[in-house]
Amino acid sequence: KLYFKDASGRGIIYHNDPEKSAAAHIAPGIFTLGEIAYMNEEGYVFLTDRFSDMVVSGGANIYPAEAEQILIEHPFVMDIACIGVPNKEMGEELKALIIVDSSRKEASEKELIDWCREKISHYKCPRSVELVEDLGRNTMGKINKRKLRAPYWLDS
């Protein structure tokens, strides 16, 4: 996780949510907003995903943004969100929810998964693909992945 240090010592305070405020801090004034990041040799910080979006599949931590960045490059894909859905053996598995470019030839689920597997480790790629009409982006362009996951976890 990416942590910040607030010189005032206050850190971050969530309105009317003291539990969330406390969980964000590892020490007074040192807090996280839930971003996963890394720093390169030159000192540049790169945000890679949100901790809350991480999928744990068979003990492996999978960051959906990796597969999303690969699959959005496929000519068939107009928009994408990868989420964790239940898997009896693995706990969770990665599922790609995709809005397609209807003006292009249709790609199969296998073709899209193979496209991803050619570029990153197999375990980081979706095990299934679902074509959807809408990902529910808000006015800021953000996707509420918790809301997208909810229907898949109703019976779990």
What are these regions (language model features)?
Residues 3-5, 12-13, 20-29, 34-124, ...:
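AMP-binding/adenylate-forming catalytic core of the ANL superfamily
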Residues 129-140:
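Short proline/glycine- and acidic-rich turn/helix-capping motifs at secondary-structure junctions
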